Regions:
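Short coil/turn motifs at beta-sheet boundaries
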Residues: 6, 51, 174, 259-261, ...
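ABC transporter nucleotide-binding domains
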Residues: 8-13, 18-25, 31, 39-244, ...
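ABC transporter nucleotide-binding domain
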Residues: 211-301
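Conserved small/polar residues in nucleotide/adenosyl-binding loops
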Residues: 303-305
């Protein structure tokens, strides 16, 4: 990443890696493969912990005031990435800064600027819509009067005013997701993480939620969302990162990805990101300016050769 790309960015991530320990057989290290430990899993090494590698050398920036989407299948590392960015867990290595604050050195400062909505609604079904929002407002430090006033604003903003006194248990799936996102905005964050926000919604509810998400971006908020749906990334995102096998394998605007990956593509993987950058510079020097770099991978649409 260049200094120019990082300047004014909401998020800067460099060489992020994350793995989890997994149960091994009688405490013996595995022989290798996807679950092998960093030492390669030498045979017979007693007491070694097998590890599942979830993220490997992930780097990217998120411009302030944009919607950036991470697209990938289940298990691609999307939720782990969001959990690291939102300070819920720490990475094994790499650097993460949010609005110039390091997530390890100043997690409290980072949390003051962000909000997160997970895959499953965090609302209390035994409370009404209004009671849920007032409750979350109080949790975020608002006094009773301010929490009530903010709840009224959010109910109107997310088209829930007519259901304000209805128990959340009676809400439809789309209404619950809107209420869940509204609860994240009781104190307006600079950055909102949305982890698969439309999972399980019908097409009409999904389109409605997309409209609310776009409005938040238009109001100046930065949003990072994960999704399994290509059409959702295309509909919402200013920039898309494709996560596969623990790495970002493609990045660009939706239009760029359609253009560059809508035909046969040559992909070359390197041991280091520096090697990939050097190779891409050589290609661009040969007038192949469509060479794209994503971490340690260089991609070139063959239609441009």
């Amino acid at each position: 990443m260049t200094d120019q790309a990082e300047r004014g960015a909401a998020i800067v991530v460099r060489d992020l890696t994350k793995s989890y320990p997994i149960a091994g057989k009688a405490g013996t290290a595995p022989e290798g493969g996807a679950g092998a430990p960093p030492d390669g899993g030498r045979k017979g090494k007693r007491g070694a912990r097998m590890r599942k590698h979830v993220l490997d050398g992930v780097s990217f920036t998120v411009p302030a005031g944009s919607i950036v989407s991470f697209l990938g299948h289940n298990g691609a590392g999307k939720t782990t990435l969001i959990r690291i960015l939102s300070t819920l867990i720490t990475a094994d290595s790499g650097e993460v800064s949010i609005f110039s604050r390091d997530v390890k050195e100043d997690p409290a400062g980072v949390r003051a600027d962000i909000a997160t909505t997970g895959q499953f609604a965090a609302i209390d079904e035994n409370l009404t819509g209004r009671e849920n929002l007032e409750f979350f407002g109080r949790l975020r430090g608002l006094d009773r009067a301010d929490a009530a006033a903010r709840a009224t604003e959010l109910l109107a903003q997310f088209s829930l005013a007519d259901s304000a006194s209805t128990l959340a248990s009676a809400y439809s799936g789309g209404m619950r997701r809107r209420l869940d996102i509204a609860a994240s905005l009781c104190v307006v964050p600079r950055l909102l993480f949305l982890d698969e926000p439309t999972t399980g919604l019908d097409p009409v509810s999904r389109e409605e939620l997309w409209g609310f998400i776009r409005q938040l971006r238009d109001d100046g908020m930065t949003l990072v969302l994960t999704t399994q749906y290509l059409e959702e990334a295309e509909a919402l995102a200013d920039h898309v990162h494709l996560l596969k096998d623990r790495r970002i394998v493609a990045s660009g605007t939706p239009e760029e990805l359609r253009r560059d990956f809508g035909s046969h593509v040559l992909r070359v993987s390197f041991a280091t990101a520096a090697g990939a950058e050097a190779f891409a510079r050589c290609l661009r020097g040969a007038c192949l300016d469509r060479a794209r770099v994503a971490g340690k991978m260089v991609s070139l649409s063959l239609i441009h050769i």
